[in-house]
Amino acid sequence: MDHSFDTIPGSSTAIRAGRSCPLHYHYGPAVFDTEPSEALRNLEVLYVVGGLYGNELALHEVLRLFDQEHGRKRLVFNGDFHWFDTDPATFERIQRAVLAHTALRGNVETELADPAPTDDAGCGCAYPEWVGDGVVERSNRILTRLRSATTAALRAELAALPMWQRADVGALRIGLVHGDAQSLAGWGFAQEHLSQASHREQVREWFSRANVDAFASTHTCLPVFQHLRCADPSSHRWVFNNGAAGMPNLAGDTAGLVTRFSTRPLAGGLSRAGVTHAGIFVDALAVEVDTAEAQRRFLAQWPSGSDAHASYFSRIVDGPSYRLDQVVRLEN
């Protein structure tokens, strides 16, 4: 889950809660070397919706866009669909709508579902060192407040969700994760890490063990479509991180983003960035909502002075300091 860049590059911290990655979050790349369930195979359209963050307006827009798609299709919420939705009625409405589709749990849902929460994991975000302590502490408190919106029945539904899935769109084999190929809260698909050649070598090794052509992820909250070359010059792999469906992703652009995979090109001009891989069209599909209403709803639950307001409101208004030309990255 995000941060709005109260960042301290190279800093160290004594805080563990919110920075640790619990052992039960781990699965490893080899789990993806399998066939998808019947519902996720032979797809013509796949939406991967990560980081909805309790934004009900964005949820309605995603469902509207998906309803316009044709053919064999599937919508997957890949975690952190809850976060700002501390109103119990809103929380339950979002959960009902999400669970009508395929869903994975993110760190938010996993921590909410814990029947005996402790302070060790905090928000479960496993924040790296470049995220400042203030963001970490506020996220831990947001999670604590969000838990008050849940019931035992709702938490049990979240606990039953898987941490990963496999999907095929056309012949494209996709690993669906919240974090990375190793862990539900891993930051291995963060744009900051993927900018480093040494880290991309690690990601190539994950691909070799996972036997997939692409990973679709979220968690780190900035969008990146990272291309990787393999030992075979004709072989290519991709990491598709949508950033956030329920918050702005780019400077001066208030749209959320979801990753759309399809055997057909996207019509309608809502692609912020796109590539074609193995005959499949992959787009960062814009989720545009009434920004004034979205801000009003956010402020009704998180007014000035609250933790989420301090961490997120400037991003909700102006977007992060991240440019469109940073999204698609090709290896030479």
Go through each PLM region and give its residues.
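Acidic, His/Gly-enriched loop-helix segments that form or flank divalent-metal centers
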Residues: 145-280, 289-291
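N-terminal active-site segment of His-dependent metallophosphoesterases
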Residues: 2-97
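Active-site metal-binding loops of divalent metal-dependent hydrolases
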Residues: 50-53, 79-82, 107-109, 179-181, ...
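Residue-level marker for buried hydrophobic side chains located in beta-strands
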Residues: 46-48, 75-77, 103-104, 175, ...
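Short aromatic-enriched loop/helix-cap "lid" or pocket-rim segments at secondary-structure transitions
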Residues: 114-119, 188-189, 253, 295-297
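Short, basic, glycine/proline-bearing loop/turn elements
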Residues: 72-80, 141, 183-190
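Active-site neighborhood of divalent metal-dependent phosphoester bond hydrolases
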Residues: 84, 88-166, 197-205
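Acidic, His/Gly-rich catalytic cores of divalent-metal-dependent hydrolytic chemistry
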Residues: 2-29, 34, 41, 228-332
